[in-house]
A protein has these predicted regions:
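Catalytic cores and adjacent binding grooves of peptidoglycan-active enzymes
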Residues: 269-337
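Amphipathic, heptad-repeat alpha-helical segments
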Residues: 21-73, 90, 94-155
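Solvent-exposed, acidic/flexible segments
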Residues: 217, 221-232, 252, 277, ...
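Intrinsically disordered, low-complexity
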Residues: 102, 106-109, 113-116, 129-248, ...
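Append "Rare intracellular matches occur via the same short Y/T/C beta-strand/loop motifs
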Residues: 62, 81-92, 145, 171, ...
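Acidic helix-start/capping segments at beta-turn-to-alpha-helix junctions
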Residues: 249-262
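Hydrophobic single-pass membrane-targeting/anchoring helices
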Residues: 1-26
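Short, conserved helix/loop micro-motifs enriched in His/Cys and acidic residues
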Residues: 205-220, 265-268, 272-287
């Protein structure tokens, strides 16, 4: 009687255990399927590629456990496989959150650059005759962008992937709107300020910080943008070899105010402020014979200046809009036109 009872209890107990193993196997199968989906969706969306490799290995491990006979699983169980798979899944999910946060941070950084340019142009166009509506549109775009940026800052602490992705996308959209509004304002200013097609309004014109300018060594009251000075020095050295004297520099970088005082709307000689390459530190006016077409000095410069990154622009050529033999520019001056 005792033996019979024991058998019955063992049988019942064993049945319960078998049921538990089946349920546990279902859990592992479900978990594995979810992990496989995560492996697929996480492609290109993690910061640590090794987490996906780890997940892939744990999925293979889980699959091999699931392929084992029920009897084997009865003795070994699936607990280890489930725990390892869960840890690998967590690692991928954490890496995906990090990746999504990185996208938001990147979007915020690129927003900052667009914002800086927009604000510079907004300020530079104040009181310059541009339609107020065009400026108001940029201001509105900047306000909307600032709000999105503040919201994104809060979202950064979220672990919700969809929310993070939405924040990054929204920042990108806002940046585009600000960029378009900035270009519209810049074009509007250009249209009313720079009458000639070879001129381009630039918010930096006449406002180059002194740290970005460099003194011309043989003409110390004159400055050009620091990055174009080495070419000018080399050009001068070659010129000196040919003519025994330095290039005569009569004009170089001009501040916004000095360009404004030179500008005479009834004469094409000086460009309106904001439209001159002198204001960018990329132009010099040269004398010592160069101020006349077809002199030896002018001809020499025409033949040699480009070797050193300097050129005589089309508008100043004989027959150009303003024939100015003396006006020379860095080749960089026309890069943006
Ligand atoms: Zn000039």
């Amino acid at each position: 009687m005792i033996i019979v009872t024991l058998v019955v209890v063992l049988a019942m107990g064993g049945g319960g255990f078998a049921w538990f193993v089946v349920a546990e196997t279902d859990d592992l199968a479900t978990q594995t399927a979810a992990a496989e989906e995560l492996l697929a969706t996480s492609e290109g969306k993690v910061t640590e590629q090794s987490t996906r490799a780890g997940l892939s290995a744990q999925i293979a491990e889980a699959r091999s456990v699931l392929d084992e006979s029920v009897l084997t699983r009865l003795t070994t169980g699936t607990g280890d496989a489930r725990e390892s798979l869960e840890a690998a899944t967590d690692a991928v999910e954490a890496s995906m959150v990090e990746f999504a946060r990185g996208r938001v941070t990147e979007a915020r950084d690129s927003l900052a650059a667009a914002q800086a340019r927009a604000e510079k142009i907004y300020q530079a166009t104040e009181g310059q005759g541009v339609d107020d509506a065009v400026r108001a549109r940029l201001q509105a775009a900047l306000d909307t962008m600032a709000a999105a940026d503040t919201a994104a800052d809060t979202t950064l602490s979220s672990e919700d992937l969809a929310e993070l992705a939405r924040a990054a996308d929204e920042l990108g959209t806002n940046r585009s709107v600000v960029t378009v509004a900035t270009e519209a304002l810049s074009d509007a200013q250009d249209a009313i300020t720079c009458p000639a097609p070879d001129q381009a309004w630039d918010p930096d014109s006449g406002k180059v910080p002194s740290s970005a300018l460099a003194e011309i060594p043989w003409a110390p009251t004159h400055f050009v943008r620091a990055d174009v000075l080495p070419g000018l020095i080399e050009l001068d050295a070659a010129y000196r070899e040919a003519f025994g004297e330095h290039l005569t520099i009569n004009s170089s970088y001009r501040t916004y105010e000095s360009q404004a005082s030179l500008y005479d709307p009834s004469s094409p000689i000086a460009a309106p402020p904001g439209c001159s390459n002198h204001g960018l530190g990329l132009a010099v006016d040269i004398g010592g014979g160069v101020e006349t077409f077809d002199t030896e000095q002018y001809t020499w410069l025409k033949q040699n200046a480009e070797t050193y990154g300097w050129t005589h622009p089309d508008f100043a050529e004989p027959g150009g809009r303003v024939p100015e033999p003396w006006h020379w520019e860095s080749v960089l001056a026309r890069a943006g036109l």
